[in-house]
Amino acid sequence: MFPLKMFKKQSQEEMIERVNFVLKRVNLENSNFKFPAELSGGMQKRVAIARAIVMNPKYLFCDEPNSGLDPNTAILIDNLIQEITDEYQITTVINTHDMNSVMQIGDKIVFLKDGVKAWEGTSKEVFKTDNEAVVKFVYSSELFKKVRLAYLNETK
């Protein structure tokens, strides 16, 4: 509740209500009295998202939101980020190396190489680009090589 105490003029009751609402939104309503060490990695990620959205931000910044998670939990986190982005009408910026996440929730993709913008486009445009840095990074995965070939054959 620290951010609410610092930046919002709300009563204790209103703050508790807001925290409970946000915890319910990220499916952690029964975990509000647990210590961080008692939470799984996926639960800790959801707590981080809850802490970020409790203040109704205009922007949500996520740094490697799926790192250290199993594939199923990573998909749950991606879905949660997408739902919250849509529901709260906020701009979300995600820094990730996970191309599955990029393709699932990225509207606009900016590819950085050595800290410099190397390419910008949509998830569909990723499959069409000839940008060497993007092709090398994205298609290091056999799955994405197959997806690209299927996409290019489909658009002929």
Q: Which residues make up each language-model segment?
A:
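Catalytic Walker B motif of ABC-type/P-loop ATPase nucleotide-binding domains
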Residues: 60-63
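C-terminal boundary and immediately downstream tail of ABC-type ATPase nucleotide-binding domains
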Residues: 124-156
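Conserved ABC ATPase "signature" region
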Residues: 12-30
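Conserved ABC ATPase signature
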Residues: 35-39, 43
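A short, proline-enriched helix->beta-strand linker immediately N-terminal to the Walker B motif
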Residues: 54-58
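Helix N-cap at the start of a conserved alpha-helix in ABC-type nucleotide-binding domains
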Residues: 71-73
